[in-house]
Amino acid sequence: MLPLLASTPARAGDYFGFQSPTGNIHCAMYTFDGNAEARCDLRSYTPTYTKRPAGCDLDWGMAFAVGSSGKGVLACVGDTVRDPGNPVLPYGEAVSLGGISCVSAKTGMTCT
């Protein structure tokens, strides 16, 4: 894993964003109430899942999130972390925050 460098992702406090080289995946890593979280939004996708969870009246299926527990979820969100101004995380490189790391690969973005 590469250490987080100021010249890599855009960073403000404990929030920074980045995108895949294709621009199809945009991610943000941040701390909330002392816990680290990572979220990635897909610009274009073809889901294999179709059942929206009960209680989710917002957008669902285009955002994935992982918290300090390490459990990944499809997020029910009313916003986006997509920002075309975010720097690119090149394939094979990684960023970390609070015990969570995201690695960019040609096959996608993996955050654990």
Predicted regions and their residues:
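Acidic, glycine-rich flexible loop segments
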Residues: 78-112
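Bacterial N-terminal signal peptides
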Residues: 1-5
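N-terminal secretory signal peptides
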Residues: 14-55
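A low-complexity, Ser/Thr/Gly/Pro-enriched, surface-exposed linker/loop concept
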Residues: 38-90
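Residue-level signal for tight coil/turn positions that link beta-strands
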Residues: 22, 60, 68, 97-99, ...
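Broad, structure-driven detector of short, well-ordered beta-strand segments within folded domains
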Residues: 25-29, 64, 100-102
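Residue-level signal for functionally critical sites in structured catalytic/ligand-binding pockets
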Residues: 21, 40-44, 66, 107, ...
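Sec/Tat signal peptide C-region and signal peptidase I cleavage site
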Residues: 8-12
